[in-house]
Amino acid sequence: MKNFTFITLGFAVSVAAVEPKFRAQEIDAKVGVGYGLQLADMDGDKKTDIILCDKDKIVWYHNPTWEKHQVSGHLTKRDHVCITARDLDGDGKAEIAVGGQWNIGESNDASKSGAVFYLNPTTDRKGNWTPVQLPHEPNTHRMHWIQSGKGKFDLVVKPLYGPKGADGRKRGAKVWAYHMPKDPTKEWSRILVSNFMKDSHNFHPIDWDRDGREEFLQAGLNGVYWFGRDKNDEWKYMQFSQNYAGEVRDGLTARGKRFFAAIEPKHGTTVAIYLQTKAQFWQRRVLDETLKDGH
């Protein structure tokens, strides 16, 4: 038994020591301004494709040939800014939503800033998909398909800034969860998730309790917050940190302790991790303070 254990551990160490090797492969040299990428199976062949949100079009590249398929031209007068892709109905093919009309200087007038679209796919997943425009807040900036139950998903959309008040200061931004009807061309219902986060650059889906309903972490001027639903499907929140943060991702240590990593502040210089504690605010550890314009 001892020899067997020794051999097993030795094998594990040798495997862990092997460094992965990668080679660069250019698949498109004609990207305008690439605002976002998603990885998902677009045509049901069980291979992960690449979906690109370019400033004036939405395209996907077919794995493994990387053949390019444009599914949308310019949806708004200004740039597209974000995209989310995920299989919502279990058919093995991802659905797409897009944010556009990127206008960082306008956070009050929704006719001049922000846009949210669901792209209704063609049968062959090629050609121009039909855009379905949804209500939106100004400054549309990030979005995710968030699982709300077994086989159910909401489109959660976050602006960068909230509206500017009479004193010239920006208020909290409204984050909405959109629910798709059976016919996506019909009216979508939506629920207000929050309205207090200021200067919020990004958010990240999680499912810490593994109940099939996802939560998310959101980074902003206020710090990093957790948002999730209770048993009555009402949105609740908890604050885990107070430092101004622009990016956030979660993980587990080798011993299984939960943590999240953040770039502080927005477009900042510092990488910090926060280890879960019994206290409200998690334990902060700085990893690096030499970043420039960290994303």
Task: Describe the residue ranges of each PLM region.
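Positively charged n-region of N-terminal signal peptides that target proteins for export
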Residues: 1-4
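Hydrophobic h-region of N-terminal signal peptides that target proteins for export
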Residues: 8-18
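Beta-propeller-forming repeat regions
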Residues: 17-295
